[in-house]
Amino acid sequence: MSDFSKGSGGIFGLGLGIPQTEKTNDFTGLGSLFESLSESVRRRSSWNDRFTHWEKAESTTETIAIERGRSVVQGILEANQGLRSEGVRFVPQGSFTNRTNVRNEADIDLRVQHPLLRIEHEAGVDPASANNAYGYYDVGRTYTQIAGDMRATIAAELKSSLGKSNIDDSGKKAIRVKGVAGSRGEVDVVSCFTLHHIFIPQGAYQYDRIEGVAILGLDGSWTLNYPDQHIANGRLKRTTTNHQFKRIVRIVKRMQSDMIEHGVITERVPSFLVECLIYLVEDHHFVMNEDRYDRVKRVLNRSLEIISQPRLNLNYYPEINGIKPLFGVKQAWTVEKAHWFLASAIRHLGEC
């Protein structure tokens, strides 16, 4: 293995047990934003009617139509001898796989994962010792060479089978496929390596590791993700909140489009961030005996309160995977952006 690198990221918990305040404080300095909360664009009954629709996942028929695109793309790539010889595996991922996608937004992701390892060492881990313990070795090829070959093969195979006009390979990370007959939406194909994150568990004296994926962008930057842990923790949260977690995620994602239509916001925040902000909220807030309007508002208020704690140690709050810090230095968003979005959503709901 070449270019072993020492990572600075840590292992984090699930963000539970955060103390709740007993009175309302202006944590964010956005007090003036809430002065206009006396009015809402809808009545409570209208909000509840919309939330009843927005919380639903797509129908079985819609699911089949969406998944057809991914199945076609995967079938094309699985038949490629070059990819087979590299030992890649094909794994679905993204909001559709997590069951947090909203209806009429049908994009679906397919991960093409190479077995070559990208090693990240947590602070305090001796790379040479850890690599020796796990038997890691250099394969003689660079990440750039393999990533370039894999991406070129994927793009060429898809263009040959589906037509050049249906393939957009200009993205930094993903190759986008559109126009699959009989399918709805588009398919994003992401090629990546297998990630091993090496760390020493608290109180232990030997190494442990977590597996994820490492994406090498066209600009040479690395993106490290943990999709399997994300799926597992999301499913657990769904169970412990009596199915309310994913319903509220869908509602808030749809609310973002509604907020743009009403001029409350002019730009979107990533759907992934929305999902993580809802995940931070303790389970009992999802299962109160109240209508949908109050439940959504309760969860949004609590999420804003959580990320607005005085002297906040932002590294305490992880993504849903429980590993990466939600507000790490390399994220595409900031805690200020999260404040702004949550406050805007609460403002949009108004007082009914």
Give, region by region, the residue ranges found by the protein language model:
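N-terminal regions immediately upstream of nucleotidyltransferase
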Residues: M1-V91, S95-E105, L116-Y137, N321-K324
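Internal, well-ordered alpha/beta segment that forms a basic, Gly-enriched binding/recognition surface
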Residues: L110-R118, G124, R141-R151
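Catalytic cores of NTP-dependent nucleotidyl/adenyl transfer enzymes across multiple folds
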Residues: E67, S71-Q74, G140-D291, R295-Q309, ...
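Residue-level recognition of the N-termini of beta-strands and the immediately preceding loop/turn
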Residues: E86-R89, K173, V187, N313-Y316
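Histidine-centered catalytic/metal-binding microenvironments
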Residues: I306-C352
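Histidine-centered divalent-metal-coordination microenvironment in nucleic-acid enzymes
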Residues: R89, S95-P115, R176-V190
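Long, low-complexity, intrinsically disordered N-terminal extensions of eukaryotic proteins, enriched
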Residues: M1-F34, R42-F51, V249-H284, Y293-V299, ...
